[in-house]
């Protein structure tokens, strides 16, 4: 389980990215790089990281499912992820 403070920080960054998305796009299209530099650092989408939806783990994230490899494996073995089953050949 990730620290609650890290999970909250990621939520705050995602909210800031969403808040400034239109303004960033307009400044970028106009080529106003000084204006872009004046925006908050957290307004850049590059600073946002993917985290597991269940426990907030930042590493080994699978985008298609929104889970880390550990939780994906656990839920897949239980059969709780539709369309996923163990490979056999």
From Swiss-Prot:
Listed Pfam families: Ribosomal_S14 (PF00253)
Domain of life, per lineage: Bacteria
Gene Ontology annotations of biological process type: translation
SUPFAM superfamilies xrefs: Glucocorticoid receptor-like (DNA-binding domain)
GO cellular component, one term: small ribosomal subunit
InterPro entries linked: Ribosomal_uS14 (IPR001209), Ribosomal_uS14_bac/plastid (IPR023036), Ribosomal_uS14_sf (IPR043140)
Keywords for the protein's UniProt record, in alphabetical order: Ribonucleoprotein, Ribosomal protein, RNA-binding, rRNA-binding
Entry's Gene Ontology molecular function annotations: rRNA binding; structural constituent of ribosome
Subunit record text: Part of the 30S ribosomal subunit. Contacts proteins S3 and S10.
Listed NCBIfam families: PRK08881.1 (NF006477)
Protein role: Binds 16S rRNA, required for the assembly of 30S particles and may also be responsible for determining the conformation of the 16S rRNA at the A site.
Family listed: Belongs to the universal ribosomal protein uS14 family.
The protein's name: Small ribosomal subunit protein uS14
Biological source species: Oenococcus oeni (strain ATCC BAA-331 / PSU-1)
Gene that encodes the chain: rpsN
